[in-house]
């Protein structure tokens, strides 16, 4: 696997779609408001809206609106839940491919995940950049003629945007976009030049042997301190995590009787670390990005599979506290204890996959669409499968009939 190295958001080496990725442009702000996907991966006529209609009184999440635009409300914290293979990871990877397509203007990777290459594949994404503009980017990839290869001529992109006004909501701003005629460039490369202000951070489950998993961010002033707190919480036998000043890119995880020296992600002897402790390293890197305000869009995918529920809840609480204004977090989990956190109902989205003959379709439903009253119990709704997102366990019990 090629490893990415980043300096101020510029990719120096590697491909775009490894399991962790950071694009950092410190002066930018990026918030996703709506996404529609058709004929990519298992997403067919898929839509997820990330605005919410009215202010929540005494919300545990502060400032879920654009600074200076109190009517422009967006879902700052997005907890994605659902059974296995329901699209939680795929959704993040699809977003990352869309972001890279808009940023790098190369279509190869996004074209590689078209589900049916004989049909049109489309996506439409609405997002805010620089706290000033709402963009709508609509992309249609048409199938090539029989015997021909896909080229840039098969790709049609429309970029429209308007400046956000003082009293605008997302809905009023979008209406103005749809009513405003804007000139369209002759090819998708020129059209995408209109898009500015992209920045993001993604983290996915990685193989424990992956070098990038253990690499210390060279430009981080807080990573080692954060890692020290997290690893000592995960493993009481760890007494400290220290940066080795005499060796660039190296740090030591120490117990009273032994140490693990990690240099540039190389891990010669960490077999004694638990899976959960190893996961803590990647989590520390994302929290460092939040604390140092390196990105404003974060996608944290199942980084807590080996970590105790109470630790996961505590770290998620810290992430939410660190988000600050004009930021956005996506967090995928199977841990139903997360439902007990006092978050707005609109923070929870449930994913499910339906199979129709030979085809499958990923769908999502936001808790606030079903639970309208403040007294409605989210935990009870999930336990009673009100969102139709519970895993199918029948086949598991059928094993007993063998």
Predicted features along the sequence, with ranges:
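Walker B catalytic acidic pair
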Residues: 301-303
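DNA major-groove recognition helices of helix-turn-helix
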Residues: 94-102, 339
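Pre-Walker A-like glycine/lysine-rich segment at the N-terminus of P-loop NTPase domains
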Residues: 8, 19-96
């Amino acid at each position: 696997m090629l490893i990415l190295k980043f300096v101020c958001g510029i990719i120096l080496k590697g491909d775009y779609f490894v399991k962790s990725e950071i694009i950092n442009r410190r002066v930018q702000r990026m918030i996703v408001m709506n996404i529609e996907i058709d004929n990519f991966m298992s997403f067919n006529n898929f839509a997820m809206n990330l605005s919410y209609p009215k202010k929540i009184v005494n919300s545990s999440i502060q400032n879920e609106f654009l600074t200076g635009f109190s009517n422009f409300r967006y879902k700052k914290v997005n907890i994605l839940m659902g059974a296995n293979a329901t699209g939680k990871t795929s959704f993040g990877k699809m977003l990352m491919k869309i972001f890279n397509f808009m940023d790098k203007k190369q279509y190869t990777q996004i074209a590689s995940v078209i589900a049916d290459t004989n049909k049109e594949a489309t996506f439409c994404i609405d997002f805010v950049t620089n706290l000033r503009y709402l963009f709508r980017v609509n992309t249609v990839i048409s199938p090539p003629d029989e015997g021909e290869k896909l080229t840039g001529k098969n790709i049609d992109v429309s970029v429209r945007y308007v400046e956000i006004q003082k009293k605008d909501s997302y809905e009023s701003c979008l209406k103005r976009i749809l009513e405003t005629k804007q000139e369209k460039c002759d090819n998708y490369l020129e059209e995408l030049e209109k898009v500015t202000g992209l920045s993001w951070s993604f983290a996915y489950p990685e193989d424990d042997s992956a070098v990038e998993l253990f690499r210390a961010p060279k430009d981080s002033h807080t990573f080692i301190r954060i890692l020290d707190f997290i690893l000592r919480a995960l493993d009481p036998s760890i007494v400290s995590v220290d940066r080795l000043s005499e060796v660039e890119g190296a740090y030591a995880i120490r117990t009273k009787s032994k140490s693990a020296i990690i240099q540039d992600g190389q891990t010669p002897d960490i077999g004694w670390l638990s899976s959960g402790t190893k996961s803590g390293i990647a989590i520390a890197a994302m929290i460092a990005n939040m604390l140092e305000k390196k990105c404003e869009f974060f996608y944290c995918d199942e980084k807590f599979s080996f970590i105790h529920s109470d630790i996961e809840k505590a770290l998620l609480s810290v992430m939410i506290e660190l988000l600050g204004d004009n930021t956005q977090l996506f967090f995928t989990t199977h841990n139903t204890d997360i439902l007990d956190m006092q978050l707005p109902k609109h923070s929870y989205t449930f994913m499910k996959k339906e199979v129709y003959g030979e085809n499958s379709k990923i769908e999502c439903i936001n808790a606030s669409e079903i639970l309208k009253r403040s007294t409605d119990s989210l935990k009870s709704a999930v336990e009673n499968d009100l969102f139709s997102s519970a895993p199918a366990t029948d086949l598991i019990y059928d094993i007993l009939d063998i």
